[in-house]
Amino acid sequence: MGFVVPPYPHDRLNAGRTRAAERWGSAIDLSIGTPCDPPPAAVVEALSTSNTERGYPTSLGSPRYRGAAAGWLARRLGSIVDPATEVAACIGTKEFVATTPQFLKLRTPERDTVLYPAVAYPTYAMGAALAGCRAVGVPVDNAWRLDLSAIDPADAARALCLWVNTPGNPAGGLDDLEAAATWGRTNGVTVLSDECYAEFTWDGPPRSILAHGTEGVLAVHSLSKRSNLAGMRAGYASGVKPAHEPRI
């Protein structure tokens, strides 16, 4: 039969959305985090005046783009990274989430498991499926935080990566990022921190896993949520020297 693409979870909601509209006339759709506010005026202006700027970008992103990303991380999260060696552009972080297990498996073919929060964004499991890997949900506690102590040692030994997402989608849990980084280093597992909601906090400063060092971790950032630029397919990863890790 070969590989059969599994149905995307959002598509499975279409029937329920239709039934709700038929019964009540409309539905409050919480299935996807599409921003409803306008993008920053400066971005709209820049896009409207860039129609003559065409060309293929470098695979890692231009030095200007990576420098801007590193500057944002420093200003907003207090994370200091080297834009030349610790930042890489990605064409949308959803694509990064969905494809990274494939590249990690090329590097470490003896491992075949993707760990991710049991209550989470569906693309973590989808990325595992596309790579031919096992998708293993890590239990969360009553506050929706990742319970690292619940990871089966057998799964840890087979893990390519561990996804963390804080504040978490959809429940808003706040993970212990230092504990996640330490767990990854102890078990030789790359920790991928999806930080697209990092600034969505009720109080207190936003947090990044990069505050606990770049060894063995990658922080993934998107412009879709925090800048109301969904569909622009712009993001970047920062951490374990991605510029020197061509397979990541």
Model regions: which residues?
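Helix C-cap/helix->beta junction micro-motif
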Residues: A20, W24, A131, T186-N187
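Hydrophobic/aromatic ligand-binding patch that stacks against planar heteroaromatic rings
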Residues: G127-A128, W183, I209
